[in-house]
Amino acid sequence: MGCCGCGSEEGSVRQWKPLEQRSCTDVLWLLIFVLFCIGMAIICGFAIASGAAQRLVFGYDSYGNICGHKNTEIKDVTMSGLDHTDKKYVFFFEPCNWDMVHLKILSVALCVTKCPDMDLKTLEDVRNFAKYNGSRLCLYNLDPTQYTSKNSKSCPILPVKSSKPIPFFHRCVPMDSGCKINFKALTTFVSYNSVLQRVITGVMTSKEIIVGLCLMSLVLSILLMVIIRYISKVLVWILAILTIIGSIGGTAVLWWLYADHKKTLKLDPSQGDVAADNVTALLVCAIIATVITVILLLLMLIMRKRVALTIALFHVAGKVFIHIPFLIFQSLWTFLALAFFWIYWIAVLLLLATAGYPQKKDQGYVEFKVSGPLQYTWIYHLVGLIWISEFILACQQMTIAGAVVTYYFTRDKHNLPATPILASMCRLIKYHLGTVAKGSFIITLIKIPQMILVYIHSQLKGKENACAKCMLKACMCCLWCLEKCLLYLNRNAYIATSINGTSFCTSAKDAIVILVENAMRVAAINTVGDFVLFLGKLLIVLVTGFVGIILLNYQRDYTVWVLPLIIICLFAFFVSHCFLSIYEMVVDVLFLCFAVDCKHNDGSPGREYYMDKSLMEFMDESRKAMRSVTGSGAEMKSMASGSDNA
């Protein structure tokens, strides 16, 4: 009996070999995934059918009328059902009065023919604007001649700031930058923490630097991907030395900037809170950088003897990239697919926020609300975000696995398909989408409790006792560890499926058996490969962060350091991880293929190895490396059960 309720697919011992004649795997899960996606489409259709798309794009007034359209009357709502064909823009009486909790403007909204393009300081200015531009800014039941102090409550709050419409969304946005940034609700939200308010301002003023450095990290990641293909002993040491110099140099610069900012603040205390925040942020960053540098130096001391092993590993992986160069761009296609889906998801979320049916409020205005079970569609939509995102990432892993498996088990590399990546992708779509759907759903089941615990933790912050806090964090830690283990298991299950064409559960079981049989060698390879890739990621973060520090240092008068710098470094790490994780996947595929190769072949006529000489030499070196760590008396288990033909 197979795992997860799956029956065993074969009564005999598993014959590991790449099957040309494949069959569809996990069809039931593919059907479930398709039905789930249909549900996502139905939610989108409901939002559009209820008028949410029109209300989102064209906007609507406080009486439920959609701007730029001829509207139907809403029962018991005065001034509804108006013809606003020539009134295409939404104008707010109090555009800066935001409710950040419910994400809406607490203001009367009207449809107008033109946004005020000048400051209107008096009601006479409002009246003249209506007279000469035909755009009435007071309630619909008032004639411009009635724009007097007697009817001031039916007119916008004075002064009316000049505004312009948002492209494609037809809302009048005030040109006053202070109004854009300092929303009343946002000010209320951060009023208890003025530091947060200054940090938000710092991010807004540093947005060009943040975007520029994020693009820089993308270029550095692609460049490092190309360099690793041709890695040698010299390049490994250069990478290590550059990382060490970058860590020490970056730490020294942070301490120097901290001392400089502190001295400047002491000489001129009038610089205010922004300068004090910068000093505090620099101190925190300097301490963190110091700790990271010390840990890095210790790791380099421990790993220095494995440089030769590292070179051999990346020489082997580099050959794969030479024969399948489009592997380098696989992360780019995945990123584009994720970006497209996330844009769609956010658009539907915005549609859901404006979906529903009109309900009359006490003031006589209209609010659109969803009642009954439909009000919980956002939960379904949130699960869709996790599952489909994980599905896309799993498709990348299966595609890479299929291409590398084809490379490994093709004896004559000149007979490889013209485009192994495309061939692997077609094989995935034709046979194994159900397996990918099942694997990604398992990760989704772990992420949902994680999100619930994070939400509970944020809601109980400052209220929970020490015991509850400890238990909550322990649960979050356990789920995090479980997620990492399942991600690793999923990755190897996809590799096994690429080799044998078996279902997810069968592939996972077979992969576990192989990994357990070769646990020591797995540890050696993962330690060596992951460490070098970590150095590469760290180097990109250090270079990007260092340039960010230098640039932000010239904006010390109005920019708080901490959040812009964190955003830059996190994005740099995310981008570098996305690209360099391809190498991790390639190494994992090569290892599992090697283990299967050794288990079923011994080099004799008719049972020749698929591996090339360089891979065999690397595996022998990895065995020696682990033997030196475990001691001369700890002999590694043979790759082939019951034989010693590794």
UniProtKB/Swiss-Prot annotation:
Residues 1-27, 229-233, 303-308, 353-373, 457-530, 581-646 are cytoplasmic. GO terms for molecular function: antiporter activity; choline transmembrane transporter activity; ethanolamine transmembrane transporter activity. It is found in: Cell membrane; Mitochondrion outer membrane. GO terms for biological process: choline transport; ethanolamine transport. Glycans are attached at residues 133, 278. Keywords: Antiport, Cell membrane, Glycoprotein, Lipoprotein, Membrane, Mitochondrion, Mitochondrion outer membrane, Myristate, Phosphoprotein, Transmembrane, Transmembrane helix, Transport. Probable choline transporter. May be involved in membrane synthesis and myelin production. This is Choline transporter-like protein 1. It comes from Torpedo marmorata (Marbled electric ray). The gene is slc44a1.
